[in-house]
Amino acid sequence: MGNRLGLTALLLIVLVTIGKAQTSYQKTDSISLALFNASEWQKLVTYGKNALNNGEDFPLLRLRIAYANFVRENYVEALTQYNKVLDHDKHNQIALYYAYLCNAYLNRDENAGYLASHLDSNVVEGEKIRSFKLTDVGAESGIKFTNIYERGNSTFSRAFIDMRLAYKLNLSASYSYYNQPIHNDNISQPGYYAKLNFTPFRRISFIGAYHYMRSTLRQLVYQNNAVLAGIKYAGNGSDIQGDFVQSQIGDEKTRQYDLKFVKYISGNLNFYSISRFSLVNVLQENNLVFQQLFGVKPMHNLWLEGVVTLGNQYNYAEADALYIYNGFDKTKFKAGANCYFLLKHHLLLGLSYTFERKSDNIFKFNYLQHSINGGITWNF
């Protein structure tokens, strides 16, 4: 008899608990839907977070919170919710589509491509999403000024093309030319660069790059090359990338180990930072190089960046080995500013200034170098 009474009491407790949970769910669902329909985005975000903290967690609530953040252009918070939905239902088309847009608006083209590969065909056709797509073409050119006779003004030019070969595979390729007067001679250096980005998972990408440079100095020809291999993890509000670069520059072998952090501080590209730590092993020395960049969007379609690089940058590879500092001298300090203006959605104009403190590689005298660079990119 006692066992029956105990079992009955337990069943009553379970039924009451379930009833309260259902009532709580119905209330949360009703209020969040009303806020959603009324376009009360900030109130919806606040209410939804409180509901989640109280254990009231269901896909529709997260989708509503995510969309409220998306409308407010907080793509990081929106992605946080969409990724939670996809963790439990990887085929949810609403979460896939808006997560695709969030990644695209954060310039994560490789992650956006992965998500596009899982969209229904009617969505792909309606949005005109293509697995093979030419994404960008452009060019940049600049000049470097020095304050000493022994080093003339050098020039740099580059033309590039970016494309998506498949939803999960991206290619960047470019041709560059660098020229630097050295006393009574010149360093002339054409270069070819290619980078593949493969994204087999929603958050993880593998990176491979190759850079070839042919340098001519005093009738000597050097076949220089650099190879990069890396992995990148795309978090909700930040990216982490680790990579390794091995290069043969002239007669010198260089090994470089990088760790890069990208933080979307404002939840979008209105305020962001990029921190990069590098260990460069060259000439039997280990040089630590640290680079810090902050970017801000002060007005519509305009971005400003400030960047500083500390450490001995001899044979230093930057931007996934796109830029190899194969100069005659060592760079000890570098700081600069970049400006980008988006004109009519497709045309991006860029202008940058760089200040460098350099040291002669043989006689050890110091000098300053100033650089001005301009670029143009057409986005398809």
Model-derived features: positions:
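Transmembrane beta-strand segments of Gram-negative outer membrane beta-barrel proteins
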Residues: E127-F145, R164-A173, F206
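Generic helix N-cap/helix-start motif at coil->alpha-helix transitions
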Residues: Q22-T28, E56-R62, H91-L96, G152-N153, ...
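Bacterial Sec-dependent N-terminal signal peptides
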Residues: M1-Q26
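Outer-membrane beta-barrel translocator/channel fold
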Residues: S176-G191, A209-V227, G242-L259, Y264-Y367, ...
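Alpha-helical protein-protein interaction scaffolds
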Residues: Q22-S131
